[in-house]
C-alpha cells in the first residue's frame, strides 16, 4: 500500500510576477462580472417534469401528515413531535402544489 510518487518532495515558492498592472484612474462603467447565461426555457416548460415532481411531493407530504394523524384517531394526545411531523407533512405537500402551479413562472416574465 505504498505510493507511486517518485519525485522530489521539496517545493519552491513561485517567483512573483514582474508585470505590474496599474489601476486606471477612471474605472470602466460596466461591471467586470459577465452577465449570467440565459437558462434553457425547456426546463421551465417541462410539464411532465413538473407533474411528476409536484405530485410526488404532494403525495409524500400527504403520507407524512396522515401517518402523524394516525395516533390522534386512536385518542392519543398529540405531543410536540406529532405536531412537528404534521407541520412538515403540510409543508412538503404545499411545496408540491407550488411546483405544480408554478406561480413564479406565470407572474414574472422570463427574460
Curated annotation (Swiss-Prot):
GO cellular component, one term: mitochondrial inner membrane
Main location: mitochondrion
Compositionally biased residues, Polar residues: 1-11
Keyword Transmembrane listed: yes
Membrane spanning stretches: 51-68, 81-101
Tree of life domain: Eukaryota
Ranges of biased composition (kind: Low complexity): 18-38
Subcellular location: Mitochondrion inner membrane
Chain spans, region Disordered: 1-40
GO biological process, one term: mitochondrial respiratory chain complex I assembly
One Pfam family from the record: DUF4536
Membrane topology, as annotated: Multi-pass membrane protein
Biological role stated in the UniProt entry: Required for the assembly of the mitochondrial NADH:ubiquinone oxidoreductase complex (complex I). Involved in the assembly of the distal region of complex I.
Binding partners and assembly: Interacts with incompletely assembled mitochondrial NADH:ubiquinone oxidoreductase complex (complex I).
Protein name: Distal membrane-arm assembly complex protein 1
Amino acid at each position: 500500500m505504498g505510493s507511486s510518487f517518485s519525485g522530489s518532495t521539496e517545493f519552491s515558492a513561485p517567483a512573483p510576477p514582474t508585470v505590474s498592472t496599474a489601476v486606471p484612474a477612471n474605472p470602466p462603467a460596466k461591471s467586470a462580472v459577465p452577465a449570467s447565461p440565459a437558462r434553457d426555457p425547456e426546463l421551465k416548460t417541462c410539464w411532465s417534469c413538473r407533474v411528476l415532481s409536484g405530485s410526488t411531493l404532494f403525495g409524500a407530504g400527504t403520507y407524512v401528515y396522515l401517518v402523524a394523524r394516525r395516533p390522534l384517531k386512536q385518542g392519543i394526545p398529540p405531543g410536540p413531535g406529532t405536531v412537528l411531523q404534521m407541520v412538515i407533512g403540510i409543508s412538503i405537500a404545499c411545496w408540491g402544489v407550488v411546483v405544480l402551479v408554478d406561480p413564479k413562472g406565470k407572474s414574472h416574465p422570463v427574460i
